[in-house]
Amino acid sequence: MAQISLESIKKIEKYRNTVHKKVHTTYTTFEMDGEKYVQIDTYGHIDRENPEKISQPFQFDRATAEFLVKLLSEEFDLR
């Protein structure tokens, strides 16, 4: 499992984009070493061999959450 590196994240231009299918998603919160984390888990498509297995986990600490809130607010013009 990996966490987002805020030191190296950057915007890139991609010319071939697709919208992915929606999949089952869950989230959990936990604390480790005094720091709170939110983990979002996505699961495979129903036709996968093991659809109950986590496909992609994403972990966010406070700094990452602040970065993503700012990014999404700017990109979607949220107020």
Name every feature range the model reports, one short phrase each.
Residues 59-79:
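Mixed-charge, Lys/Arg-enriched low-complexity segments
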Residues 21-54:
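A short, structured beta-strand/loop element
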Residues 1-21:
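Negatively charged, low-complexity tracts enriched in Asp/Glu with abundant Ser/Thr
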Residues 1-4, 25, 71-73:
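N-terminal functional modules and adjacent low-complexity/disordered segments of proteins
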Residues 9-12, 45, 63-65:
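Generic structural motif
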Residues 8-11, 26, 57:
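Residue-level preference for alpha-helix termini and adjacent loops
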Residues 6, 30, 58-59, 65:
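Mobile acidic interaction elements
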Residues 3, 39, 56-59:
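Residue-identity detector for glutamine
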